[in-house]
Amino acid sequence: MHYPKVYDVIVIGGGHAGTEAALAAARMGRQTLLLTHNIETLGQMSCNPAIGGIGKSHLVREIDALGGAMALAADKGGIQFRILNSRKGAAVRATRAQADRVRYKAAIRETLENQANLDIFQQAADDLIVEGDTVKGVVTQMGIRFDAKTVVLTTGTFLGGVIHVGLEKSSGGRAGDPPSIALAQRLRELKLPVGRLKTGTPPRIDARSVDFSVMTPQPGDFPSPVMSFMGDVSMHPEQVNCYITHTNEKTHDIIRGGLDRSPMYTGVIEGVGPRYCPSIEDKIHRFSDKDSHQVFLEPEGLDTHELYPNGISTSLPFDVQFELVRSIRGMENAHILRPGYAIEYDYFNPQALKFTLETKAINGLYFAGQINGTTGYEEAGAQGLLAGLNAARRAWEQEEWTPKRDQAYMGVLVDDLITLGTKEPYRMFTSRAEYRLMLREDNADQRLTTIGRELGLVDDVRWAAYCEKMEAVERETSRLQHLWAAPNNPMGKKFVEMTGADLSKECSAIDLLKRPNINFSQIAELTGSEVSQQVGEQIEIAVKYEGYINRQHEDVAQLKRLEETKIPADFDYDVVSGLSREITQKLKTVRPETLAQASRIPGVTPAAVQLVMITIRKNNMTKKTA
């Protein structure tokens, strides 16, 4: 059957990348189709039941600032909230939400089903319709043809997915779901650069069989933080503890004894696993000097006894899993509800993409999520939103948009993937962002919501809330600039009495806030401020980090000069005099779009960038005089 409706955007896959892609395109007014093999799994958390964390919450806040769904779903489904790095600087603070899987998934599905311009259809996609070098649509498992101006692929771990438990293996996209075999074969036919990666998950445990009394409880923060700029604590369901226990030497001996049947250590698995989320067998092998490793027992939800033992991801045979679990303190009688497993899947070298996440080889075809070599819900959601908005803009022949490295962690993510590529699952960290003081999770809305409004991603309700917040920040900052404390006036005396600090000369309330040991809550008490905690936080960070932020703005200005120098798509690096063969090859492989991108390619020296710039300028001068 040839479906009668022509879509602007078709999104294949209903995971974290797919849902954000479909929602973004639909919010922008494009006729959008979301194809999923199973409507019941829309927004499913396939691995750990958590959103956010170091570097990751910055992405979640950016998705949220652009009108995305992930942060609000985390607020509606979060059963524990914590601020990580709370004693460190604002740039590296991160919010983490332990999520109830069912509530999170329900929140995502509710958002999808109530989104205008979005159709959902339950069918696996088996084929792409490609005419010449342009995608024209999709063919499903039943042979239904859907036509579209653009297609976004967000296939997660489903492309050629193989599940491993010990030396046994089976086809699967995740436990209980079939893989995408036909689509994987079709993509390989298109001559896109393909590789194999792997990820894993731990065995799930029945909480009724665990002795929590010998473990360390890990409560959430109080007052509880929120994930979304539109979130409120009243959205949160009941809050619960996680628990911490440890592996021991007996656990490690059991694991070592099972390595001869490990698919990782017998060469059965060829795909590379995530460096920063290693399996327990990998930890024992790589960190043999450690006599224990932490295990975090995380509730999967309020209405289930299922626990996620974060820290013991494994693909060892089930009998070894059984022994290693029961060797851990408090889990001596643990009942395993689901075995752990590893999954191996196809991904495509992201260097074959444009910065918009459109493939260079096929016009109108976009990739987002694990298909690009990333790991994590947050990384997937960020790519999905970018791919969806750019597919939407291309469908209406509008100029596409991608944030720069100094604008967003999304920009860092995309630039890293396309400039550097990846041979292992890529995870975001704050350390990857050179301008992280400007890219804090607290100011994601200031960086992106205005842009999101211009792109059509931000609705009236969010826009009004953002404008109200920024007006409050401006009003309160101005008020504090005009309130003065002097050694002998009432405000000055109250300040000294409250804080025990010295006050030798007249200072504005803003100047007092610049002091290292003074926080906004003290200034609020001193001056009778009634603004929200969120507004106060913005003012405090802006005041305390003003000098550092100004310095980063200067660095960005220098970078922009390189960003503004575009490298023509057909630029011939072979004619650049003085370039080494190695650097020439690297530049030809990556095909950087700007001098700034060229400067970030490993091994490309500042001198080489200078040579390319000189050649571009010479070429431009030649064209002008011709």
UniProtKB/Swiss-Prot annotation:
GO biological processes: tRNA methylation; tRNA wobble uridine modification
GO molecular function, one term: flavin adenine dinucleotide binding
Keywords: Cytoplasm, FAD, Flavoprotein, NAD, tRNA processing
Subcellular location: Cytoplasm
Annotated residues for binding of NAD(+): 273-287
Entry keyword Cell membrane: no
Cofactor(s), by name: FAD
One Pfam family recorded for the sequence: GIDA
Gene3D superfamilies found in the cross-reference section: FAD/NAD(P)-binding domain (3.50.50.60), GidA associated domain, C-terminal subdomain (1.10.150.570), tRNA uridine 5-carboxymethylaminomethyl modification enzyme MnmG/GidA (1.10.10.1800)
GO cellular component: cytosol
Flavoprotein found in the keyword field: yes
Coarse class of the protein's main subcellular location: cytoplasm
Function per UniProt: NAD-binding protein involved in the addition of a carboxymethylaminomethyl (cmnm) group at the wobble position (U34) of certain tRNAs, forming tRNA-cmnm(5)s(2)U34.
Similarity comment: Belongs to the MnmG family.
Protein's UniProt name: tRNA uridine 5-carboxymethylaminomethyl modification enzyme MnmG
